[in-house]
Amino acid sequence: GSMKPPVVEIDKLWSVFHEAGRDVVIHQDLDLRIDAGELVSIVGGSGSGKTVLLRQMLGLEVPARGKVTVLGEAAASMGREGAASRVGMLFQHGALYSAFSVLDNIAFALRELKTLPKDLILDVAMVKLRMVGLNPADAHKMPADLSGGMVKRAALARALIMDPPLLLLDEPTAGLDPGSADEFCALLQSLHEELGLTVVMVTHDLDTLLELSTRIAVVADRHIVASGSAAEVMAQPHPFIKEFFLGERGRRASALIQAPLRPPAHLFSDTET
């Protein structure tokens, strides 16, 4: 193991929501450590607070108790600008601003900084547009004219505009047909490797999970009940795990779990002094 500090460290996290006049505890003493270059997939049943964990890492939710540290800093204290340059987030509905062109959507966070000249901002946005496999001709299209896969790509480019070392993905293949989902997975895999990103992904799609993960973490009973390869996770005798991996959709998973997980992305920062 490396002595590098973790990219994400969640320590004894309590997430509590107020509903109908009472406190609902979503996470209780949840611990999770994510190291540089990992692509960790978080799985759990509905109501297990998977997206809440992503929002905690983004600083959009504040821990009721415990600590969420991202790149050495309390997530909740990063502020919007600090967060954008450190953490990119692809929300499930990858909503683009409908009144802006694709290129202007991608450039959005850079524009808000108001520190760069306009032509430079558009140049940077164009580089990101190409990086996610869109064509220069797509730059001036409006979101309404895009396929679902193109919307995801544009939203991904927007999340990566400030070169954050950490990328959060919420159900990245949801709503895509199988062909588009496969293509988007391939894109995520190559970006993870080429950019040396650390990625945290929430998904309930087994193909996406087994294709991309370097590690799988299972949230149940308000904390992480298992973490490791698919085979290691499936060896845990937990009802949710059995249902998830071996239920209806999981019939083929038992064949797939023999497949090893991907290694973490090679980190260029390892060569720095």
Protein language model regions, located:
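Catalytic Walker B motif of ABC-type/P-loop ATPase nucleotide-binding domains
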Residues: 167-170
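Conserved ABC ATPase "signature" region
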Residues: 119-137
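Conserved catalytic motifs of ABC-family nucleotide-binding domains
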Residues: 163
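ABC ATPase NBD coupling module
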Residues: 75-88, 112, 119, 233-236
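Conserved ABC ATPase signature
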Residues: 142-146, 150
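Helix-to-loop junction immediately C-terminal to a conserved catalytic motif
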Residues: 58
